Amino acid sequence: MTSTRKSNPIMKMVNHAFIDLPTPSNISMWWNFGSLLATCLLLQIITGLFLAMHYSPDTSSAFSSIAHITRDVNYGWIIRYLHANGASMFFICLFLHVGRGLYYGSFLLLETWNIGILLLLTVMATAFMGYVLPWGQMSFWGATVITNLLSAIPYIGTDLVQWVWGGYSIDKPTLTRFFTIHFTLPFIIVALTTLHLLFLHETGSNNPCGIISNSDKIPFHPYYTTKDILGLTLLLLLLMMLVLFLPDLLSDPDNYTPANPLSTPPHIKPEWYFLFAYAILRSVPNKLGGVLALLLSILILMAMPMLHKSKQQSMTFRPLSQLMLWLLTTTLITLTWIGSQPVNQPFIMIGQMASMTYFTTILILMPLASLTENKLLKWT
């Protein structure tokens, strides 16, 4: 008799996706981040749902409703901090997941890669909307600065900003629509994640060697489910350490002051996971140029398949390309640090140099390193 998981229509889909899925036998812990991201998403949706039950999307009561959740709601403090720090964990896993894709050449699976970039942009939009909801000083001024970037668009910029705000300044309509969009986007992320998986399972996973592994595959369960549980345990351990011991480590103290349109904070900055893009935005003196650089800092990932000049898919056996990727990594860390600093020297100069290095590494140095390696291996 056929097993239920192979005969039941719904179970059959689950079986093909997570149980009997043929998986390369040599994929490392770097392939663990997909399941960790799914866990983070589930955690964010569950905690967000409970927070939404007590949150009030109104400028007069939003800040106090957050205080009410933290002080009065049963276990409200842990739900709130799980949601806030869960977002940080989400982005740590996202950046590592994208980094793994760059290192092992997973961007050559075009559909999967492009949907992944779309997912990254959607998650960033969701996180930005969520940062505005507590209606603290940094929420208000962060929203003001970022939404104002739309005014750089020629002809329609000002009208577009006022349309997003729902008035002539950030007020109640802005908060209401940001809450609505923040609530809706995670479900769109779930749909995109399903598409991401669908396209991945069409081609099969890449592997550390970057070679076809059809001749050596093993079922996903129990081998990789067990392996994923280890990664999940470490992720939850790190998250719970943050939530229980250092819940405000990654948040801004200014956000514990209610939003005041008449008082500007000394240094407006977004959450830590946006600082690299914020530093690139600030490094261009022209407003429109800065906005374009900001967009390109993420959208440049879409060009990776075209910039791939190596005869090998993975960087495992390409030391020059590895060096370029680590240069890119250190540049991103530098940009993150610069984004958190005030706008004065030497930070302006360091930010401009790091921004130039970021784009130069991706557009020029990485393809050049690949071509050099081809030449050295006489693969031209």
UniProtKB/Swiss-Prot annotation:
Binds 2 heme b groups non-covalently. A ubiquinone binds at residue 201. InterPro entries: Cyt_b/b6_C, Cyt_b/b6_C_sf, Cyt_b/b6_N, Cytb/b6-like_sf, Cytochrome_b, Cytochrome_b_C_euk/bac, Cytochrome_b_N_euk/bac, Di-haem_cyt_TM. The keyword Heme applies. Pfam families: Cytochrom_B_C (PF00032), Cytochrome_B (PF00033). The chain crosses the membrane at residues 33-53, 77-98, 113-133, 178-198, 226-246, 288-308, 320-340, 347-367. It is a multi-pass membrane protein. The keyword Electron transport applies. One of its GO terms (cellular component) is respiratory chain complex III. Heme b b566 binds at residues 97, 196. One of its GO terms (molecular function) is ubiquinol-cytochrome-c reductase activity. It is found in: Mitochondrion inner membrane. GO terms for biological process: mitochondrial electron transport, ubiquinol to cytochrome c. Heme b b562 binds at residues 83, 182. It comes from the Eukaryota. Its cofactor is heme b. The cytochrome bc1 complex contains 11 subunits: 3 respiratory subunits (MT-CYB, CYC1 and UQCRFS1), 2 core proteins (UQCRC1 and UQCRC2) and 6 low-molecular weight proteins (UQCRH/QCR6, UQCRB/QCR7, UQCRQ/QCR8, UQCR10/QCR9, UQCR11/QCR10 and a cleavage product of UQCRFS1). This cytochrome bc1 complex then forms a dimer. Belongs to the cytochrome b family. Component of the ubiquinol-cytochrome c reductase complex (complex III or cytochrome b-c1 complex) that is part of the mitochondrial respiratory chain. The b-c1 complex mediates electron transfer from ubiquinol to cytochrome c. Contributes to the generation of a proton gradient across the mitochondrial membrane that is then used for ATP synthesis. Heme 1 (or BL or b562) is low-potential and absorbs at about 562 nm, and heme 2 (or BH or b566) is high-potential and absorbs at about 566 nm. This is Cytochrome b. It comes from Colobus guereza (Mantled guereza).
